[in-house]
């Protein structure tokens, strides 16, 4: 549903504006350098599990994905249509998980994961993102976590955990925002729910 709605709003003018806004300045210069530096040697393919799982299909190599996404945006000066962006979004969200293995194989240091993250950013700004990914992005934006846990809910959960733990450990405390603490507890997001 999110892809369909995003595509309806993605006029060629809006697509061009979003791409140009994201790729302006230093970001655009960095992308252009990567595009010109990439030798298209395919060394990155040896590291990509998507490419390795499709050995007879060169379109799954990281360099092919870049050519069909971010490098295409640069070559076309952002002048793409909604259907092209749908294909780009599919590649960005289903053919690369940005594990960064490819970077270690690239002889010239092209940061492929960074480039794919830019593609995802552009898709996100256009609303051409799978619903479950968009929901996670919205949650992070609103609550700084992927489970929609508000700060007051988190504090209530910690108070409750502290009370429960006192049965076994009298006097235990879970201090919040304590400077100079010896330990920091980083919780798994679903835990407070």
Protein language model regions, located:
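Ferredoxin-type iron-sulfur electron-transfer modules and their immediate structural context
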Residues: 1-93
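Iron-sulfur-cluster electron-transfer modules
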Residues: 28-35, 68-193
């Amino acid at each position: 549903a999110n892809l369909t709605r995003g595509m309806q709003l993605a006029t060629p003018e809006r697509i061009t504006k979003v791409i140009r806004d994201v790729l302006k300045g230093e970001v655009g210069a960095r992308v252009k350098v990567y595009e010109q530096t990439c030798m298209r040697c395919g060394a990155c393919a040896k590291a990509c599990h998507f490419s390795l799982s499709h050995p007879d299909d060169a379109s799954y190599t990281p360099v092919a994905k870049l050519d069909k996404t971010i490098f295409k945006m640069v070559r076309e000066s952002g002048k793409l249509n909604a259907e092209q962006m749908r294909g780009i979004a599919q590649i960005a969200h289903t053919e690369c998980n940005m594990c960064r293995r490819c970077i270690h194989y690239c002889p010239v240091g092209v940061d492929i994961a960074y480039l794919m993250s830019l593609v995802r950013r552009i898709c996100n700004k256009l609303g051409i993102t799978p619903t479950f990914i968009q929901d996670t992005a919205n949650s992070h934006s609103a609550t700084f976590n992927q489970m929609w846990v508000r700060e007051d809910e988190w504090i209530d959960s910690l108070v409750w955990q502290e009370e429960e733990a006192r049965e076994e450990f009298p006097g235990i405390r879970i201090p919040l925002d304590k400077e100079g603490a010896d330990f920091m507890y980083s919780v798994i997001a679903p835990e407070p729910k």
